[in-house]
Amino acid sequence: MGNIFSSMFDKLWGSNKELRILILGLDGAGKTTILYRLQIGEVVTTKPTIGFNVETLSYKNLKLNVWDLGGQTSIRPYWRCYYADTAAVIFVVDSTDKDRMSTASKELHLMLQEEELQDAALLVFANKQDQPGALSASEVSKELNLVELKDRSWSIVASSAIKGEGITEGLDWLIDVIKEEQL
């Protein structure tokens, strides 16, 4: 009986479980800016991530270990080293970088084929919406062929890491899905 109440309490208000979330995407998409926007609520000066940044965030009564992995071509093959025990992937796309949308789509779908990520929820940030010429979230969704993702919870959110727009809404959706499906 106690286990039933404990389980219900955890589902409603969170648990002490630590969740691993990966922030992935091509170089220059805004991954590190999003990470630190989530952690400290402001924009910090960043440089290209060679390797990774990892921060622990408390959000909605959950402890999130958020791994921001570099997106350069030479680093992407190493993403798979971080897939184990991942609850969710945040994939960040530079909505102004139309020339690399097909590369972003290829990398996204390759990654999602990995067995270790089969149960991971996916949040896509169509980032840099504050920039002229940015594709809308629905246009980015089409470019990434997100409609092909049949057996996975996913969402795409228009965002501007610099202005802080869309970040909280996206993370709220992600945490709700994780609580519903994995906790």
From Swiss-Prot:
UniProt keyword annotations, A-Z: ER-Golgi transport, Golgi apparatus, GTP-binding, Lipoprotein, Myristate, Nucleotide-binding, Protein transport, Transport
Compartments in which it is found: Golgi apparatus
Phenotype of null mutants: Decreases the physical interaction between MON2 and DOP1.
GO cellular component, one term: trans-Golgi network
Principal location class: Golgi
GO biological process, one term: protein-containing complex localization
GO molecular function per UniProt: GTP binding; GTPase activity
PROSITE patterns: ARF
Top-level taxon of origin: Eukaryota
Keyword Transport in annotation: yes
Additional remarks: Present with 5190 molecules/cell in log phase SD medium.
UniProt family annotation: Belongs to the small GTPase superfamily. Arf family.
PANTHER family: ADP RIBOSYLATION FACTOR-RELATED
Role description: Recruits golgins such as IMH1 to the Golgi. Can bind and hydrolyze GTP. May be involved in trafficking events within the endosomal system.
Name of the protein: ADP-ribosylation factor-like protein 1
Species assigned in the record: Saccharomyces cerevisiae (strain ATCC 204508 / S288c) (Baker's yeast)
This protein's encoding gene: ARL1
